[in-house]
Amino acid sequence: MKALFVRCYGRLTADMMIGGLIDMGVPPVYLKSCLSDAGITADFMEKLNPAAQISAHYFHIFPEAFEGPLYMVSFMARWRSLCEKVHPEWEETGWKVFRALASGLPEGKDDLSLNGVSMENAVSLYLLLCCLDYLETESLFTIPFSIEKGTSEAARASLAILKSAGATDGEPVPAEDIHPFAAAILEGLSADFISMDGRFLSDKTAYGSSSADKPTGDNTVCLYLGYYTDRAESVFGRHMKVFGANPDLEL
């Protein structure tokens, strides 16, 4: 069973995860074709970070022109329009992320922009799923990490969203460094938050960068693509898949 593990060391955005998947082998021209096929008008920038101490890719979706509050209903309508032409089956996959995202909103509020979420984040999610589909990823897992509280509204949201993050013996990741939409992707799409063990055979390792040119301190998301060998007792039989769900799992 092919799986992707995500390890977060610090700063994390959805675009950084896409950058890591490009570094893993997803061609940027493929992502451009995905946008074209879906009738999506969106521009992005991608480049290898030549100054990084390790191979890392930078990726960034340019902001869409959108003014005023960003309500969940508008965000979901944008998501539906992205999926309907080529991948209508991904609409439900997005709902998993949006449910997690909603848990980070202040009580009685429905404006996603309060948490730093913007309309182009929907395009980031679509391209992330395109990357996972290209790599034939069947399930996504997140390696547990502890989170340090922050003071901003976005930090409060990320902490509220990541209910499953758990804890490790490593340094805690500041909630200020985790974008709420990236937090919702991990919480909504991860089959589980577990450590890699002997069942997982890593085939590729890649990094996403939050900078196109800084040499250190920016390659804080590591992605591992590989296979589970113990299929009889595999977690895959018991947990949500990226593109679908266990029929016994209540969403």
Residue ranges and their predicted role:
Residues P28-Y30, D133-P247:
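Mobile "lid/hinge" segments at catalytic clefts and subdomain interfaces of large enzymes
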Residues L101-E153:
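Gly/Ser-rich oxyanion-binding loop with an adjacent helix/lid
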Residues D15-P27, E84, Y126-E136:
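Alpha-helical support elements that line or immediately flank enzyme active sites
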Residues R11, F59, L186:
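Divalent metal-coordination and catalytic microenvironments
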Residues I22-M24, G244-L251:
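Short, surface-exposed ligand-recognition loops at beta-strand->loop->(often short) alpha-helix junctions
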Residues M1-F5:
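Extreme N-terminal starter segment of soluble prokaryotic enzymes
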Residues V6-R7, V117-E120, A175-I178:
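Glycine- and other small-residue-rich loops at beta-strand/loop junctions that grip anionic moieties
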Residues D23-G108, P174-E176, P180-A183, M196-F200:
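Glycine-rich nucleotide/cofactor/substrate-binding loop typically near the N-terminus or early
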